[in-house]
């Protein structure tokens, strides 16, 4: 169903008001929160201060106090499968990431390439109007590619 025209059409174009809303890209709501994922390798769950650990992490603690902390996520002990889980919300074997990408063997659930139909969080956020940015090592493509 098409949206009703929200502009005004008068006798003269100078007195008319166009409606560009059907052609505008999606935008995140004005009060939408920022989403920040921080992924670290080789850090135990309880190592940082915000989780009761012995390492002093005042900046991370401050971010954690103002945001949401996830304590019931499943990740793996390997970087590629963990990143694929965080990006898609799916189990690493559903993402064909049974191991790190250098060890991908090309068999089902172990090809080292995330199937496009799994979708990724940046795509979903982008469709809803958020801008996304990634920096750092991702390790999500086999070396043969």
Specify the residue positions occupied by each region the protein language model found.
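Formylglycine-dependent sulfatase
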Residues: 1-145
């Amino acid at each position: 169903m098409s949206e009703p025209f929200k502009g005004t059409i008068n006798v003269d174009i100078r007195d008319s008001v166009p409606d560009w809303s059907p052609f505008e890209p999606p935008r995140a709501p004005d009060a939408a929160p920022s989403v920040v994922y921080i992924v670290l390798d080789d850090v135990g769950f309880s190592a940082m201060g915000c989780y009761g650990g012995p390492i002093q992490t005042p900046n991370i603690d401050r971010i954690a106090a103002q945001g949401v902390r996830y304590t019931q996520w499943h990740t793996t002990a390997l970087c590629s499968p963990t990143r694929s889980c965080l990006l898609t919300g799916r189990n690493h074997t559903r993402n064909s990431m049974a191991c790190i990408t250098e060890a991908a063997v090309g068999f089902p659930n172990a090809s080292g390439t995330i199937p496009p139909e799994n979708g990724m969080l940046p795509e979903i956020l982008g469709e809803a109007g958020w801008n996304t940015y990634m920096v750092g090592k991702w390790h999500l493509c086999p070396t043969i590619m």
